[in-house]
């Protein structure tokens, strides 16, 4: 460790003929591994927070449409409450994802612009809401949509912005709150971007 805070320095020491040196390559790999591990743990917790937020949204019916449906988007349309987050005035109750968005803002997220056509990243991961489930999900295959409202359930996929750099595993969760993970490999972004349903077959493993 180094410094007053005993920060665990990632580069191991190597003994050479002329003395001890730091193994820079091993240090770089350890830094990446630590970042991946941290991002993946944060992502699991974020997914569980989204599940709680969706349940709160459905219970409260903030858009006053008369249905206890789930939100189809994370950020509400301007002037509406059709997503899990919307701006609030002083003294107003937070939106379901208000605390999470506030924490992200404190960390500097949301100050820049997201890549064109892609969801904004948070701790190295992007998130998408899914509106259906496949035959491998409990209850079999069906759409969560009823007359364009997300009534039958919801699901979310979270995938790394850069596979093997910002994360390795892709994660999915639905309204039951069980998070599954799978390594989709180098084609992670394409596979996750094209995912249309929550379908945890035997290749997906539940997160313990």
Report residues per predicted region:
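Conserved hydrophobic/amphipathic alpha-helical signal-anchor segments
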Residues: 28-77
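Short beta-strand edge/turn micro-motifs at domain boundaries
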Residues: 6-37, 178-182
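Flexible, glycine-rich surface segments
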Residues: 57-165
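C-terminal soluble interaction/assembly domains
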Residues: 152-208
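Solvent-exposed loop/turn segments at secondary-structure junctions
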Residues: 5-7, 27-30, 132-135, 161-164, ...
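Acidic surface patches and DE-rich sequence motifs
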Residues: 2, 16, 174
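Exposed beta-strand-loop-beta-strand "reactive/processing" segments of non-cytosolic proteins
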Residues: 1-12, 154-158
């Amino acid at each position: 460790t180094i410094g007053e805070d005993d920060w665990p320095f990632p580069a191991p020491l190597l003994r050479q003929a002329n003395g001890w040196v730091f193994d820079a390559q091993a240090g770089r790999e350890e830094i990446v591994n630590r970042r991946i591990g941290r991002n993946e743990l944060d992502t699991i917790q974020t997914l569980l927070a989204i599940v709680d937020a969706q349940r709160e949204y459905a219970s409260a019916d903030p858009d006053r449409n008369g249905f206890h449906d789930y939100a189809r988007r994370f950020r509400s349309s301007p002037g509406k409450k059709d997503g899990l987050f919307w701006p609030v005035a002083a003294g107003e109750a937070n939106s379901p994802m208000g605390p999470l968005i506030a924490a992200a803002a404190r960390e500097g997220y949301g100050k820049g612009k997201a890549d064109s056509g892609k969801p904004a990243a948070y701790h190295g991961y992007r998130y998408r809401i899914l509106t259906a489930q496949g035959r491998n999900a409990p209850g079999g295959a069906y759409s969560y949509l009823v007359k364009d409202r997300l009534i039958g359930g919801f699901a979310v996929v979270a995938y790394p912005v850069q596979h093997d750099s910002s994360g390795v595993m892709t994660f999915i969760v639905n309204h039951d709150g069980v998070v599954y993970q799978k390594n989709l490999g180098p084609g992670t972004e394409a596979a996750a971007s094209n995912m249309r349903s929550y379908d945890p077959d035997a290749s997906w493993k539940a997160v313990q």
